[in-house]
Design a protein with these regions (language model features):
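Beta/alpha (TIM)-barrel catalytic core signal, keyed to glycine-rich beta->alpha loops juxtaposed to Asp/Glu
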Residues: 1-169
Length: 171
């Protein structure tokens, strides 16, 4: 990094303990630690599975939020598949393994309900939920069309008031 070759390094799909251990070892060696961790994260969540290390757990989000203060190098969290590969807006899309359960279906139903109330799309509501939460998470999106990109960018202007967020969180 000192030579300007690499601005920030990151890690993906690993357990929190590995992130912490790698960052501590980097500091011991006098090099910049990982500044970013990328995990799967979205409004719906998978059923818990032993060994599932690709999900941005609350513990990971909390750890990242504790960095960047008191001399600790910051750690940003990015989320891949934040719109569940289109499943929030396309009922023909099968849910990923681990996501096909009643809570996901209820959360998708609620996304549609809230989107209707706000004049937004379910994807916009899901991304606004991710962007405006207690822990900062940066969504990584991969739209296939300009229309999809425009839709997703609309989430940046959508703010969920505390009552709506509580309603979404409670599902």
């Amino acid at each position: 990094q000192a030579e300007g070759v690499v601005g920030i390094t990151g890690i993906s799909n690993v357990a929190l303990w590995r992130v912490v251990e790698a960052r501590e070892e980097a500091l011991r060696q006098g090099v910049a630690p990982y500044g970013l961790v990328q995990q799967n994260y979205t409004y719906a969540y998978p059923t818990p599975e032993p060994g599932r290390h690709n999900w941005a757990s609350y513990e990971l989000l909390d750890y990242a939020a504790s960095t960047g203060v008191e001399g600790r190098p910051p750690l940003a969290v990015t989320a891949y598949s934040p719109i569940l590969q289109g499943a929030y807006v396309r009922r023909d899309k099968p849910l990923w393994d681990g996501f096909d359960h009643p809570t996901t279906r209820e959360r998708i139903r609620l996304l549609h309900e809230v989107a209707g109330e706000l004049g937004a799309t379910p994807n916009q509501v899901a991304l606004a939920w991710l962007l405006g939460g207690e822990h900062a998470v940066i969504p990584v999106v991969g739209p296939s069309t300009v229309e999809q990109l425009d839709d997703l960018l609309g989430a940046a202007d959508l703010e969920l008031d505390p009552e709506l967020r509580a309603r979404l969180d409670a599902a």
